[in-house]
Amino acid sequence: MFLLKRTFQPHNRSRKRTHGFLSRMSTRGGRRVLKARRLKGRKRLTV
């Protein structure tokens, strides 16, 4: 048998780097995500 480990090890830096506002703005797809969230009326656009 194998043991299942907890895969989510939270770190604020990696969280911001992958899902933050600047990383969203840096790519075309990310800007699309922000646009979609604005249109939907999300209170928080990014993390």
From Swiss-Prot:
One MF annotation (Gene Ontology) recorded for this entry: structural constituent of ribosome
Pfam families registered for this protein in UniProt: Ribosomal_L34
Compositionally biased residues, Basic residues: 29-47
Region (Disordered), start-end ranges: 9-47
Gene3D superfamilies membership: 1.10.287.3980
GO cellular component term of the entry, any: ribosome
GO BP field: translation
Keywords noted in UniProt: Ribonucleoprotein, Ribosomal protein
Residue spans crossing the bilayer: none
PROSITE patterns named in the record: RIBOSOMAL_L34 (PS00784)
HAMAP family: Ribosomal_bL34 (MF_00391)
Record family assignment: Belongs to the bacterial ribosomal protein bL34 family.
This protein's name: Large ribosomal subunit protein bL34
Organism of this sequence: Symbiobacterium thermophilum (strain DSM 24528 / JCM 14929 / IAM 14863 / T)
Taxonomic lineage from the root: Bacteria, Bacillati, Bacillota, Clostridia, Eubacteriales
Gene symbol of the encoding locus: rpmH
